[in-house]
Amino acid sequence: DRDAQTLTDERNDQGDGNFRYEFETSNGIYTQKTGTPGSEGQSNYQGSFRFPLEDGTIAEVTYIADENGFQPSSDLLPVGPPAPPHVQRLLEIAEDQRRQGITFD
């Protein structure tokens, strides 16, 4: 949209790895992100973005990115089927074995 206007453009960078920004336009595009230094040398991010779809609905994604990777959350993202009962039971057995100190080499 060539006629979109910037409504919000806020940026705060403390210079020590901590930052926050927020950006919004008149055509419904919005993003915000906060960053902090991580305990394992990584940067930790938490944020969201949204934008209008052609049908007029709004697509929105929230996320966390840290030592565990990028973890998005949105109604737009596909969800896999649940694990079958036998797989869930095997995972429970494996967790019990880990707690007992049992390892397999």
UniProtKB/Swiss-Prot annotation:
One Pfam family from the record: Chitin_bind_4
GO molecular function, one term: structural constituent of chitin-based larval cuticle
GO CC terms: chitin-based extracellular matrix
Highest taxon of source: Eukaryota
UniProt entry tagged with the keyword Chaperone: no
Domain Chitin-binding type R&R, residue spans: 16-81
PROSITE patterns per UniProt: CHIT_BIND_RR_1 (PS00233), CHIT_BIND_RR_2 (PS51155)
Keywords, in A-Z order: Cuticle
Descriptive protein name: Cuticle protein AMP4
